[in-house]
Amino acid sequence: MNPSNDHIDISKESTQTNKLHFAARNRIEELRETINYHNRLYYERNSPIITDEAWDALFDELKQLEIKHQEFLTDDSPTQQVGLPPRKPFSVIEHRIPMLSLSNAFDADGIRTWHKKTAELTRRNNFAMVTEPKIDGLAISLIYENGELARASTRGDGTHGEDVTENVRTITSVPKYLAKNSPNTLEVRGEIYMSRDGFDRLNTEIEENNLILQRSGQKAKRLFANPRNAAAGAVRQLDPAVTASRPLAISVYQLAWADETVPSTHWKTLKWL
């Protein structure tokens, strides 16, 4: 055995490890910056420039790198955040229970991993599951007091959301009053969305108005990129009249809390809602 050769081999291995370590840190920083940029476009401006699939790929790559290199994981990483803080034009509402976002499973392996974790958490190998359509819109919290809609807020950063009560009151499909046998106080959560037909009609109206604007030498308005952006932008308008003019609907999928006894399972809750 040649000690000098051993020293050279160890040095080479150490150098290679340092290079990989440095490359991982740089990639993590790059991914965080990129994801934060696209989050601002998505949440604040409602104008994303990449697809949900592309964003998911970036997010998943960052998450895997942080799992592999936990020394680089920090509290301000996008993987540790939910949404963005509320914008200043709206007053802030603190969520009684945090509004969290959903995780994704892209393939059969992802579903099996989720199933295994759920079985471990519940300590049950066999359990019933409820499957629901994922409607892509704006997550909303509705609080009812004495049977009347009292507050509506966005998810925001998961802990604090924007008070959009006046805007949400203009949406015809959002119940303003509940049945007399409802709990005195409760919070439900759901998604405010725009149907594909409504989205197409809205963009057609914008195109027609743009022709008039262009004839008078005024700047044309941008079309909406997708129904999700159109719905989110409509709810977060400073003028409730604009919200009222948009073809919005709501799908309620969760009872967050109530001051009375409520159904014991999610399936029973959905039927009750």
Briefly describe each language-model feature range.
Residues 2-273:
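RNA/tRNA-interacting regions in translation and RNA-turnover enzymes
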